[in-house]
Curated annotation (Swiss-Prot):
This is Speedy protein E11. GO terms for molecular function: acetylcholine receptor regulator activity; protein kinase binding. Belongs to the Speedy/Ringo family. The lineage of its organism: Eukaryota, Metazoa, Chordata, Craniata, Vertebrata. Residues 66-80 have a biased composition (Acidic residues). Coiled coil: none annotated. It holds the Pfam family Spy1. Residues 1-80 are annotated as: Disordered.
Length: 265
């Protein structure tokens, strides 16, 4: 009886921890190790199991976008147009020259044509039979000066025509005497025949009578206006021969372009 009790007591005693062995799996590895070495199975639905790809940086994306935006601009950018005019024809060959487009707007041609109907300007052009103050090149310079001054076309009046014509004579003519008669046509409208006055005679006449002194004050005012007109053009009074030809080519059949000194007999 005592031996039986002793065996029962020994069977209920706890075994040492070292003698316990972990539970083995069917493969012979501990369960804990098997769990650690497991490969993850398929992920949840809707989740990409592949590792995420490395996306391009924002700077690189922006460069790509800039390059793609520049391509249509390069394709759509218009090339500068050139104007070619046929100059001579020789058999089947044609010689052409390039001509730049005139910057004079049509409204300034209209202002010029309107002022040609002024009675005082008509008398000046009719009087100048020798074309000493109003040949075709000087009149073309008037249109160029209208364009450079930049006033609206409806603001140009008789005084502006005389200012531009006088300034054109200053630039192109060496003889000072003929252009002095422009003053008399502007301020003395009743005269139909005015002799060409030299500078000395002009200086003498202004001291002889009160009327001449009045004209002297008007001439001084005219020269003041001429200076203001010259400044409004930003002091650009020189006009090239090419530009003068372009102005005449706008309306080549205009009657003022027949005022050529080369055609005088």
């Amino acid at each position: 009886m005592g031996q039986i009790l002793g065996k029962i007591m020994m069977s209920h005693q706890p075994q040492p921890q070292e003698e316990r062995s972990p539970q083995r799996s069917t493969s012979g590895y501990p369960l804990q190790e098997v769990v650690d070495d497991e490969v993850s199975g398929p992920s949840a639905p809707g989740v990409d199991p592949s590792p995420p790809r490395r996306s391009l940086g924002w700077k690189r994306k922006r460069e790509c976008l800039d390059e793609s935006d520049d391509e249509p601009e390069k394709e759509l950018a218009p090339e500068p147009e050139e104007t070619w005019v046929a100059e001579t024809l020789c058999g089947l060959k044609m010689k052409a020259k390039r001509r730049r487009v005139s910057l004079v707007l049509p409204e300034y041609y209209e202002a010029f044509n309107r002022l040609l109907e002024d009675p005082v300007i008509k008398r000046l052009l009719a009087w100048d039979k020798d074309l000493r103050v109003s040949d075709k090149y000087l009149l073309a310079m008037v249109i160029a000066y209208f364009s450079r001054a930049g006033l609206p076309s409806w603001q140009y009046q008789r005084i502006h025509f005389f200012l531009a014509l006088y300034l054109a004579n200053d630039m192109e003519e060496d003889d000072e005497a003929p252009k002095q008669n422009i003053f008399y046509f502007l301020y003395e409208e009743t005269r139909s025949h005015i002799p060409l006055l030299s500078e000395l005679w002009f200086q003498l006449c202004r001291y002889m009578n009160p009327r001449a002194r009045k004209n002297c004050s008007q001439i001084a005012l005219f020269r003041k206006y001429r200076f203001h007109f010259f400044c409004s053009m930003r002091c650009r009074a020189w006009v090239s021969l090419e530009e003068l030809e372009e102005i005449q080519a706008y309306d080549p059949e205009h009657w003022v372009w027949a005022r050529d000194r080369a055609h005088l007999s």
